[in-house]
């Protein structure tokens, strides 16, 4: 509970961005995250822009934040970045209910997720 004892340190050629409390299930978020893993950031941004999934816009926002972190905080070249990791985790689950027939009560779970995107600079081979 609380803070991690040893937070993960990023390498010299990496940058990271996190989004927490995303209002979607981890399973649905992982479908979009799997779509961009290992791709160049330009191609990943294009894929997210034209995706029909609702959560794709939030993933795009997190990826743009990771790119900005790489450029401004780590002085990395944006044209040589790839999506090294797109990690999805489970967050809290809001529990709601709905009255059902014969006096019963149906449980409704409203899951939240978190997303961590790591971008890495790779040198192009000629």
Swiss-Prot record:
Q: Which Gene3D superfamilies match?
A: Ribosomal protein L22/L17
Superkingdom is Bacteria
Mind telling me which SUPFAM superfamilies this protein's record contains?
Ribosomal protein L22
Per UniProt, the keywords (alphabetical) are: Ribonucleoprotein, Ribosomal protein, RNA-binding, rRNA-binding
Q: Name one GO molecular function term.
A: structural constituent of ribosome
Q: Name one Pfam family in it.
A: Ribosomal_L22
Name the Gene Ontology biological process terms.
translation
Q: Name one GO cellular component term.
A: cytosolic large ribosomal subunit
Spell out the PANTHER family in the cross-references.
CHLOROPLAST 50S RIBOSOMAL PROTEIN L22-RELATED, LARGE RIBOSOMAL SUBUNIT PROTEIN UL22M
Please give the NCBIfam families that the UniProt record associates with this protein: rplV_bact
Tell me, how does this one assemble?
Answer: Part of the 50S ribosomal subunit.
Report the family membership: Belongs to the universal ribosomal protein uL22 family.
Protein name (Swiss-Prot/TrEMBL): Large ribosomal subunit protein uL22
What lineage does UniProt assign to this protein's organism?
Bacteria, Pseudomonadati, Pseudomonadota, Alphaproteobacteria, Rhodobacterales
């Amino acid at each position: 509970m609380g803070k991690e004892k040893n937070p993960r340190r990023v390498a010299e050629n990496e940058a990271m961005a996190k989004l927490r409390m995303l209002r979607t299930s981890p399973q649905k978020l992982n479908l979009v995250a799997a779509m961009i893993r290992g791709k160049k950031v330009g191609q990943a941004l294009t894929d997210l822009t034209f995706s029909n999934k609702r959560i794709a816009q939030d993933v795009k926002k997190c990826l743009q934040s990771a790119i900005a972190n790489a450029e401004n905080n780590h002085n990395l070249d944006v044209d040589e970045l790839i999506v090294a990791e797109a990690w999805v985790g489970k967050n809290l689950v809001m529990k709601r209910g709905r009255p059902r027939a014969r006096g019963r009560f149906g449980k409704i779970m409203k899951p939240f997720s978190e997303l961590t995107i790591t971008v890495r600079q790779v040198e192009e081979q000629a």
